Amino acid sequence: MRRRILSILGSTVLLCGIVAMSATNVSASGKELKQVDGSYLTTEERSTGYTSSPDLRGVHLMDGESTISKAGISRIYAYGATTANHKVKYMATIVYVDRYDEKNDEWGQIDAWVAEDENTYYMSTAKSLKVERGYYYRVHCNHIAGNEYPY
């Protein structure tokens, strides 16, 4: 009889543990990040994106990187880098900085710049920007690398 009671008690504890784990997983998955035009709205200190597909890279381009990070109160740091598979005649990184407009549920461009270089396989560009607090910001880049015009 004692074994039977211990067996039932052990089974009950195991069942309660399984139910508790399941409840924890359900509540954790409820924190979905909102995605707007391919970008997740997050409060992380830093976010980095890379070229997503080998098809987008072409013959010369190996990798493209875009990074945004907090750089103090009311400041962000925007960074873009382009890497080629080999030395190319022309390379450029076009960096766009956008702010999320919650009222219209869309991104609006607040800054952009172009960095160019020749006869290289790597380049990067960065800028620190003063921004208004209370908004979401993102950085995205166009990466160009080639040997013949048009690139």
Q: Where are the regions a protein language model picked out?
A:
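Exposed aromatic-hydrophobic patches
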Residues: Y121-V131
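Solvent-exposed strand-loop boundary residues in beta-sheet-rich modules
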Residues: D101-K103, N147
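N-terminal prepro-regions of secreted/extracellular proteins
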Residues: M1-S69
